[in-house]
């Protein structure tokens, strides 16, 4: 049986706990640090490790359809200690259970159309959602799945870049080019296809912003106003506007270090309601003054979307009718947490073609497939620098090349903006070139964005 199924499988729970503690002591501080165990990890790590294992392996199994060995290898890239988790797959229930040394066991379950989330007692909201599913369309992209405009020279270039990437261990899984509103080239890594639903991590933030822009266009909210969270009504956080949340200049005290015990890991992997976790965070700076990248803020935007529409079911239905269908998404899943609120910080799984639809919507000024989803004015604001004192090159959950004294990518056009996710996920929009480039993969280090994308632009 494979290694990820049998760690400490036959040891009773109490013995697992004791063995785990003895192992921590026996390894010593230097050895512990070398495999990812710090004093903070001893306190917070088991819950985080069990949560990330259950959640990511569940989605890999039942959303992506990854090979289990590959999914486990991807997981362990985050920390060597994750190689020590025990994992149990329950195909009958479509659930994955994980624990570290038998401690803090967590189970994530799959719901068709909703993907996976860690289960928590007394949080039935997600399981009660009525989910819609549609057959893929054979209409031409971006309305459907048909692609007929492949350019042989551009296709050959992307094939070369994919081969070069993966010969260097960059693990590129999809690379796609849209030019002039058509897919001109697309390539996929081993085991991946044009239908593979790939995790965008923080690129979900950019879709989250579009969803709020849609509500603003339809008159449901004014982004210049506050979000109206009752938890903030009696203190200084009431001064935070929805625009400050979109530009991550809200001033909330939220750490995004991804170490055990920090806010991001606690929110993502140990909290039944991600937005409730962030609603309790205090201010660390005056609203509007400083940019602080925060997945917590993104999940507050998801909460705003849900509250504005009247609850999880109404939010889900609105997303399906006003976003998913008009955009022509074919192979995409937006996961929620146990409370039924979209995980706007992290958990949108979609094919490369679906991710490209998001970029094309922005490039088209808010229109796709004959539907206006956001206003032109919203697009202009979303892609303009914020007014913070420390980092202006960020719009409404979209990264900007311009805004600071120097460009983020000096080799690329100044007007570029992009969605960006962990492991070097990218949807980059090039207005001057009328192009969108999508890159999906699992790269733990740097990716040659400027070099590769400049080569593609030169070939247009």
Placement of each model-derived feature along the sequence:
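Active-site Gly/Thr loop motif
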Residues: 329-333, 380, 384-437
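Non-catalytic propeptide/linker segments at domain boundaries
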Residues: 99-167
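Short, well-structured active-site flanking segments
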Residues: 68, 214-233, 255-256, 308-335, ...
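Active-site SXXK
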Residues: 181, 198-223, 245, 301-305, ...
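Active-site-adjacent helix/loop patches that line small-molecule binding or acyl-intermediate pockets
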Residues: 235-327, 352-364
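Structured C-terminal helix/loop/strand segments within mature extracytoplasmic catalytic/sensor domains
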Residues: 37-50, 63, 71, 419-460
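A short, well-structured edge-of-sheet supersecondary motif
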Residues: 98, 155-192, 427-428, 434-438
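Active-site-proximal alpha-helical segments within enzyme catalytic domains
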Residues: 209, 296-306, 344-368, 425-441
């Amino acid at each position: 049986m494979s290694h990820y199924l049998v760690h400490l499988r036959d040891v009773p729970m109490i013995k697992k706990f004791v063995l785990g503690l003895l192992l921590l002591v026996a390894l010593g501080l230097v050895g512990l640090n070398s495999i990812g165990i710090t004093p903070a990890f001893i306190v917070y790590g088991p819950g985080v490790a069990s949560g990330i294992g259950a959640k990511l392996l569940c989605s890999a199994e039942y959303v992506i359809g990854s090979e289990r060995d590959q999914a486990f290898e991807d997981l362990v890239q985050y920390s060597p200690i994750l190689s020590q988790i025990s994992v149990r797959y329950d195909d009958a229930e479509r659930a994955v259970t994980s624990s570290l040394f038998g401690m803090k066991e967590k189970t994530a379950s799959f719901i068709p159309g909703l993907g996976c989330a860690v289960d928590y007692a007394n949080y039935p909201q997600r399981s009660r959602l009525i989910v819609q599913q549609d057959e893929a369309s054979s209409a031409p992209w971006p309305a459907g799945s048909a692609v007929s405009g492949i350019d042989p020279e551009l296709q050959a270039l992307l094939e070369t870049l994919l081969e070069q990437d993966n010969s260097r261990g960059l693990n590129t899984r999809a690379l796609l080019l849209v030019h002039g509103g058509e897919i001109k080239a697309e390539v996929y890594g081993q085991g991946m296809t044009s239908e593979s639903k790939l995790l965008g991590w923080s690129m979900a933030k950019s879709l989250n912003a579009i969803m709020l822009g849609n509500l603003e266009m339809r008159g449901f909210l004014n982004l210049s106003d506050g979000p109206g969270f009752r938890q903030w009504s009696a203190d200084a956080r009431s001064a935070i506007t929805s625009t400050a949340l979109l530009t991550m200049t809200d001033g909330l005290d939220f750490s995004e270090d991804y170490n055990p015990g920090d806010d991001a890991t606690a929110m993502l992997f140990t909290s039944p309601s991600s937005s409730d976790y962030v609603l309790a965070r205090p201010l660390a700076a005056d609203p509007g003054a400083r940019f602080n990248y925060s997945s917590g803020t993104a999940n507050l935007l998801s909460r705003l979307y849900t509250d504005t529409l009247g609850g999880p079911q109404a939010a889900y239905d609105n997303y399906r009718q006003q976003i998913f269908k008009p955009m022509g998404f074919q192979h995409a899943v937006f996961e929620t947490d146990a409370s039924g609120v979209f995980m706007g910080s992290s958990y949108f799984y979609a094919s490369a073609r679906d991710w490209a639809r998001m970029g094309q919507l922005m490039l088209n000024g808010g229109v796709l497939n004959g539907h206006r989803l956001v206003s032109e004015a919203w697009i202009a604001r979303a892609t303009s620098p914020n007014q913070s004192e420390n980092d202006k090159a960020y719009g409404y959950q979209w990264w900007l090349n311009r805004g600071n004294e120097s460009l983020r990518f000096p080799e690329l056009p100044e007007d570029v903006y992009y969605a960006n996710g962990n492991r070097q996920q990218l949807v980059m929009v090039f207005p001057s070139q009328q192009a969108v480039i999508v890159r999906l993969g699992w790269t733990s280090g740097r990716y040659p964005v400027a070099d590769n994308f400049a080569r593609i632009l030169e070939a247009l």
